[in-house]
């Protein structure tokens, strides 16, 4: 069967389920797929984690090295987030330099970490104005079955939680745990008409192009927000999505207690 016909069949099936107020996998509209967080999966990294979100899989590795601070923050360490989306993870990804999708993914994850002040960057100063710790957070998509963003955000914070600052390697004292003080969690919803689907799968993404990602910190404060697509949200739907995102984030944050 030609690929385009198969896509149309799947799309029609998703839409028919939505008309019956159902999702194709039986989940509630505000329900995530099964989440599994596995820490310390990359032996040579300072910190790492693998997240499985349904059939979506993302691994994040953290590396650290001394470097110069940004001129406007001489008393703070530096976090740099990168994302790599390779064809192995999805036929829609192309080889080559980072495209706009990987850049946007890295930017949204970075914003959640930065705006929540998840890492105490003031404790990553070696010599103020001269040398600080640079934290490289590298996101690698292994399998994209929808909602790479939330899986990446979970994997990033999980990897940071088990990161050790490699001070001994650089003759800068003893190693110590990266000072993580918050757990930002992002929740992405697909908007289809007057309905929303939390944690959309790849098949569900075929019926709409408008998503809203809301990132909250451990105190339920919104620290980042990202909307894609052209659908205009009314105030009632936005308020509902905000409440749902906060509640989902609370549940996801409980997963960190299991690692």
From Swiss-Prot:
One Gene Ontology MF term: mRNA 3'-UTR AU-rich region binding
Keyword annotations: Cytoplasm, Exosome
GO cellular component: cytoplasmic exosome (RNase complex)
Segment forming the signal sequence: none
SUPFAM superfamilies, alphabetized: Ribonuclease PH domain 2-like, Ribosomal protein S5 domain 2-like
Function: Non-catalytic component of the exosome, which is a complex involved in RNA degradation. Contributes to the structuring of the Rrp41 active site.
Name this polypeptide is given: Exosome complex component Rrp42
Organism lineage: Archaea, Methanobacteriati, Methanobacteriota, Archaeoglobi, Archaeoglobales
């Amino acid at each position: 069967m030609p690929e385009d016909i198969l896509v149309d069949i799947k799309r029609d099936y998703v839409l028919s389920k939505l008309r019956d107020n159902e999702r194709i996998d039986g989940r509630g509209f505000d329900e995530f797929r099964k989440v599994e967080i596995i820490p310390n999966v990359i032996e040579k990294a300072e910190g790492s984690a693998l997240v499985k979100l349904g059939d979506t899989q993302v691994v994040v590795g953290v590396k650290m090295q001394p470097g110069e601070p940004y001129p406007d923050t001489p008393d703070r360490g530096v976090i740099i987030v990168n994302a790599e989306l390779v064809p192995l993870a999805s036929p829609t990804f192309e080889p080559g330099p980072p495209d706009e999708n990987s850049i946007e993914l890295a930017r949204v994850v970075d914003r959640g970490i930065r705006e929540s002040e998840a890492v105490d960057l003031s404790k990553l100063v070696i010599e103020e104005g001269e040398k600080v710790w640079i934290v490289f957070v590298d996101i690698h998509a292994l399998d994209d079955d929808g909602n790479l963003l939330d899986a990446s955000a979970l994997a990033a914070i999980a990897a940071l939680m088990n990161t050790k600052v490699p001070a001994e390697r650089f003759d800068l004292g003893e190693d110590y745990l990266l000072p993580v003080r918050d757990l930002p969690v992002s929740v992405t919803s697909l908007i289809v008409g007057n309905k929303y689907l939390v944690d959309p799968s790849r098949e569900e993404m075929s019926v709409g192009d408008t998503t809203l990602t809301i990132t909250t910190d451990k105190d339920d404060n919104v620290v980042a927000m990202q909307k894609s697509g052209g659908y205009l949200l009314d105030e009632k739907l936005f308020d509902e999505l905000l409440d749902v995102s906060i509640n989902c984030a609370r549940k996801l944050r409980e997963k960190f207690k299991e690692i």
